[in-house]
Design a protein with these regions (language model features):
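C-terminal secondary-structure termini that scaffold catalytic or DNA-interacting sites
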Residues: 30, 66, 96, 108-110, ...
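Basic, Lys/Arg- and aromatic-enriched nucleic-acid-binding interface segment
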Residues: 2-55, 65, 76-81, 100-101, ...
């Protein structure tokens, strides 16, 4: 061949992951408290829901007794119905919204449905909290990262977050390398140990 044929190599997409440490998240919540979206931040960090799903949440989708919020397929990015397990913190946030609006759970300071997060308030809160390079969607990344770091499997994370495929949550796998320890131990006796221990392992 005079020339080497060009072959397109498949590159797996690795989306940007930016997540907060718990103390950073608490700092953000504290500075946001004067604004209506402090509860939105808390709710997002405890459910992993996308902004549109949080803002569009209606009272008829919430079952406080069963501690679940239901979303229809046409409301979800993956096109599949999702039942969101609500922890006690998320339940407390929802209860604080009681009586503000007959249809929507979350409203602004005028008790009107929220169509979008006020970017000025959001940027001001980030600046006051000393947080850089962070978007609202990164609250979802933070939620997922915290779960994986605490031992939740990627399969369960996929189900909880409503991702369409397991490949979509592989981006978080590096946050929980504990399962690789037993494989790393294989090489521990080859170098860097004293002569007595090496001899003992050979025998």
């Amino acid at each position: 061949l005079d020339t080497v044929p060009h072959i397109e190599m498949y590159k797996e997409y690795e989306g940007r992951i930016r997540w907060l440490r718990p103390e950073e998240a608490q700092r953000l919540i504290d500075v946001a408290r004067p604004h209506y979206f402090a509860d939105l931040i808390i709710f997002s960090l405890n459910t992993g829901l996308r902004q549109g799903n949080v803002l569009g949440l209606k009272w008829n989708q919430v079952d406080l007794e069963r501690k679940v919020a239901w979303y229809h397929p046409d409301e979800m990015k993956a096109g599949r119905a999702l039942g969101v397990a609500l922890n006690d913190t998320a339940i407390e946030v929802i209860k604080r919204q009681t009586g503000k609006h007959p249809t929507f759970v979350f409203v602004n300071k005028r008790n009107n449905p929220i169509t979008d997060i006020n970017s000025r308030y959001w940027k001001e809160s980030l600046k006051q909290a000393g947080i850089e390079d962070f978007t609202w969607h990164d609250l979802r990344h933070t939620w997922a990262s915290w779960l994986v770091q605490r031992g939740v499997s990627l399969r369960i994370l996929q189900e909880m977050g409503g991702w369409k495929t397991l490949a979509m949550v592989q981006r978080y796998a590096h946050l929980a390398p504990e399962h690789l320890h037993e494989h790393a131990e294989i090489l521990q006796s080859l170098v860097g140990t004293d002569d007595t221990n090496r001899a003992h392992r050979r025998n």
